[in-house]
Amino acid sequence: MENFQKVEKIGEGTYGVVYKAKNKLTGEVVALKKIRLDTETEGVPSTAIREISLLKELNHPNIVKLLDVIHTENKLYLVFEFLHQDLKKFMDASAVTGIPLPLIKSYLFQLLQGLAFCHSHRVLHRDLKPQNLLINAEGSIKLADFGLARAFGVPVRTYTHEVVTLWYRAPEILLGCKYYSTAVDIWSLGCIFAEMVTRRALFPGDSEIDQLFRIFRTLGTPDEVVWPGVTSMPDYKPSFPKWARQDFSKVVPPLDEDGRSLLSQMLHYDPNKRISAKAALAHPFFQDVTKPVPHLRL
């Protein structure tokens, strides 16, 4: 750790404080994540160390690079490449004018490329949200915190007792499914896609049941026809209200037909029928994709 000079605290992640820091030897600016684990007393579990070490092999232009893992006594520091801003802050700053559609399309395309790469290596994210999608001034967007959920679990609250958001959580997780797939990340990205377009969260639930009911009110309450097996999921209740599906043109009015088609496939109830990242990249919505540069206020 003595090789790093902390410059400033840049945030509080799910697992601990994040600092902007400088490598004293190379001058490289990095993001330093201090992982606070519940097992402070026993030190860091070896399983977590193994999981995290595997992530150093994930090299892709749309994945935030894990540069190093520093394990001291009972603390764990992860050294990542540094990016200037997250998508949440960028969306907040663009709330009045909105994000131009070509930039939304570029961001979604890049994020799907990053997802397709990780999914092909059997790595899930499980906790995608605008706060862990990082952008730079060149128009790139990258997925951060990939694989951390498997190494450390997804807590209900962060180390500062903030509630971990449910807004982007797939319905199969909310319904208690223990064995989920890469499809959970596609769902999260679909929610983020809609949020970039409409400038508001698609399903801003404040509890697990509120989250489910917001999804049901928009997409209709799922049944065995649209989602075989749903009624036998651990947290499914026959007493759930039966809502009808809303017309997608009213849910995301600014989107054209191709955009609505892609979004509806990303938000398919049945995880087995939900579009894969690889298939989504070939969707007609992306036939005119470019890479515009964002107007960042850094």
From Swiss-Prot:
Gene3D superfamilies in alphabetical order: Phosphorylase Kinase, domain 1 (3.30.200.20), Transferase(Phosphotransferase) domain 1 (1.10.510.10)
Tell me where in this chain the PTM Phosphotyrosine is found: 15, 19
Is DNA damage a UniProt keyword of this protein?
yes
Description of how activity is regulated: Phosphorylation at Thr-14 or Tyr-15 inactivates the enzyme, while phosphorylation at Thr-160 activates it. Stimulated by MYC. Inactivated by CDKN1A (p21).
One Gene Ontology MF term: ATP binding
According to the UniProt record, list the residues that bear N-acetylmethionine. Answer: 1
**Annotated site (CDK7 binding), which positions?**
9, 88-89, 166
Q: Which residues carry this modification: N6-acetyllysine?
A: 6
Q: Does the keyword Cytoplasm apply?
A: yes
Co-factor note (free text): Binds 2 Mg(2+) ions.
What about PTM?
A: Phosphorylated at Thr-160 by CDK7 in a CAK complex. Phosphorylation at Thr-160 promotes kinase activity, whereas phosphorylation at Tyr-15 by WEE1 reduces slightly kinase activity. Phosphorylated on Thr-14 and Tyr-15 during S and G2 phases before being dephosphorylated by CDC25A. Nitrosylated after treatment with nitric oxide (DETA-NO).
Name the catalysed reactions: L-seryl-[protein] + ATP = O-phospho-L-seryl-[protein] + ADP + H(+); L-threonyl-[protein] + ATP = O-phospho-L-threonyl-[protein] + ADP + H(+)
Name the SUPFAM superfamilies for this protein.
Protein kinase-like (PK-like)
The top EC class is transferase
Q: Which UniProt keywords apply?
A: Acetylation, ATP-binding, Cell cycle, Cell division, Cytoplasm, Cytoskeleton, DNA damage, DNA repair, Endosome, Kinase, Magnesium, Meiosis, Metal-binding, Mitosis, Nucleotide-binding, Nucleus, Phosphoprotein, Serine/threonine-protein kinase, Transferase
Please give the function described in this protein's UniProt entry: Serine/threonine-protein kinase involved in the control of the cell cycle; essential for meiosis, but dispensable for mitosis. Phosphorylates CABLES1, CTNNB1, CDK2AP2, ERCC6, NBN, USP37, p53/TP53, NPM1, CDK7, RB1, BRCA2, MYC, NPAT, EZH2. Triggers duplication of centrosomes and DNA.
PANTHER family for the chain: CELL DIVISION PROTEIN KINASE, CYCLIN-DEPENDENT KINASE 2
Give the record's family classification.
Belongs to the protein kinase superfamily. CMGC Ser/Thr protein kinase family. CDC2/CDKX subfamily.
Query: What is the protein name stated in its UniProt record?
Result: Cyclin-dependent kinase 2
